[in-house]
Amino acid sequence: RPALAARAPDSVQSPPVAPGRKLVGVVLYPGFEVLDVFGPVEMWAYVPDFQVVMISQDGGAVRSAQGVSTLSDYSFASSPQLDIMMVPGGIGTQTELNNNAMLDFIRKQNEKTQLTTSVCTGSALLAKAGILKGHKATSNKNFFSLATSQDPSVDWQGKARWVEDGKFITSSGVSAGTDMA
């Protein structure tokens, strides 16, 4: 059987957190947008002081909106504290807006992150979690009303490609996440 046809494992051994490196965690969920995740990951992979990990509610494989599965390094329960958290967008955002485990994880991690970031409709999840109150933020222009309806106390910026406000960096549609990173 060719190596490329080999079945991927259902789980991976979580990598140890390397001392002195910033831990960048990407929060995956069913229906995430591939480019929202892997555009920024490509940029962060070149930063020598960054260690990038994938996190999902239950760990294991998570299927994207494009049908490609990605293995999580950690579940919400096993995740270490992140220095930088990134929440991508995707069609699955609409389901996750009602997922208390997701919203609780975002709130808990955000308490101690140095940066909390999002791509596309990921900002809707940050807003729904209540962590963007009083901050400037943006989202995908095609789904802007989805994000803005989650928390009207956010200072939503409709024309921005990305917005930095304190420790929050939000970006609009897919490729803007690469620019943000």
Residue ranges and their predicted role:
Residues 164-180:
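Conserved anion/nucleotide-ligand pocket segment
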